[in-house]
UniProtKB/Swiss-Prot annotation:
An annotated Gene Ontology molecular function: tRNA (adenine(58)-N1)-methyltransferase activity
Composition bias, Acidic residues: 280-289
Subcellular locations according to the entry: Nucleus
Name of the protein: tRNA (adenine(58)-N(1))-methyltransferase catalytic subunit TRM61
Amino acid sequence: MFSAYKDTIEDGDLVLGWMTRTAIKPIVVEKKEGLFNTRYGAFPHRNMDKYGAQLGSMSKQGFIHLIHPTPELWTLSLPHRTQIVYTTDSSYIVQRLKIRPGSTVIESGTGSGSFTHAISRSAGLAGKVYSYEFHEERYNLAKQEFERHQLTNVIPTHRDVCNDGFDIENIDVNATAVFLDLPAPWTAIPHLERVIDRSVVSRVCCFSPCFEQVVKAVQALQEAGWVDIEMVEVAAKRWESRLEMKRSLDEAITRLRDVKARRETGLAKRNARIKVETETGVEEEESDERDAKRSKTESGHRGYNPWGKGQKIKEGDESFEWTEVSKCEQEIKSHTSYLLFASRLPKLGEEVFDKDMCVRPYSERCPETSTEGAEASTEATEAPARTEA
């Protein structure tokens, strides 16, 4: 379901009902008796035929769009069991951990399964995702959800990794990427040595809301031999592109002059009317009623109006000139968590590089060879001295 796309909606499929940008509801299709009720009306499942289609309600009061599920859209519509990892963070984490088709990934803290769907797609059918959850109820719900969504490369495990580690009986994990979403990740870091692939570079990311957690995790990573430690905080803003009507200075000046002229004309007419009413003795109520009718009639004419003020104009109308502009959100999305990254060098790499990722001196990398070379050099230096004697 999440690893491949299709056009036709079948019985038992998952459909995301898109109502608004902030209202997306998951629907498990039941063709015979299913009915999706919203404030826009009722939508029978039997009418759900194609992904991407627009479906009208039975009462003709509104419509929804039938969207194919993706990890990004599932993040916006899933039932929350815990705090989740949103796409802003998950996309960056996948890139930093270098998760790709065929990767073996460890995830500790399954929670609502938001990030699990993202890394399952990135690892592909050739990869494996070992997901650990210590809370039994959340583990059972997540396991059922993964089975319904056909995430066949996800292996969920019920375990407290902080105390019991990551080992799985009869399985050699050999992970190259690790994601820890735990209250105390520093207690789980020492257990990683047994389950990461030491023949290549392994990478870890700790997802921690509090800075104190980051400090303790950094200490644990350093003690366990991890290098290239870096903390990142992702702050995202949404940019919206649209068309805006062009307004020249000459048009603005002409518009202001026209408004001023019409104001002066209106004031002159009003003064003349008051003078006539005073001379003729017309009653005030009749005068007010006549003024209301006249203002209503004259309001339809706005004089010089180059930008269609007061009119309903469709964006991009060829009667006006437009330019493309981008507008940023006023507020940055609030802080979610700190992302702590680190790398574990392969065994060969540890012989070449130190903890600061600097190349070790040759004498440290090959102590035996360097000792033999030093002895040979000493003998070569002493030999001519004996000859001269």
